[in-house]
Amino acid sequence: MDKIHIAVGSTRRPKLAAVTQALESFGPVLEPAAEFAVLGFDVESGVSHTPSTRDELMRGARQRAESLVRLAQQRHEAWQYFVGLEGGLDTVQVDGARHVFLESWAYVSDGSVGHYGRSGGVEIPAALAHEVLENGVELSQAIDRFAGEVGIRDAQGAWGVLSRNLITRQDAFRVAVLAAFAPFYNSKMYRAASAAR
């Protein structure tokens, strides 16, 4: 049985569990006879602690994956996939009103090509958005204070607090990972679509 190594740019439990859970869904399609090993590493995103734009979220996820590619080259590792995960805020103006959404993004690379995926978004309360965007408080600290708990980011995350645990941080990243891996586990369709252009 082949062993496929998937390097993840985080050591946080919800992120690693999200990748593992996503693999349970698409792994048999990606590599039918393979065993998967998820490896977590602390790598820098190159963006702020709480990204506040879609561009910053996407850049952070991609830069984490690219850091893993470089790490594999330096260590002479034969990892097959590199996963960068980034959570944060996306601000949208609609009819002059600001709406701030919590989103989770993934970027998956095989070392040559990469693809993005994201979760849905949940609108955060205006007071929480103000605390993070105007006062510069990191989201993990602000959500702990708003919820009256400690260590939320390593548990259900802001997603869980905002959705009464109907959607957790792990759930959101799982969706982002499923979406980012789609061009790999559904490569036939993606190649056909590219050829039809």
Predicted regions, residues:
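Anionic-ligand binding patches
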Residues: H49-R197
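N-terminal polybasic phosphate/anion-binding patch
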Residues: D2-E77
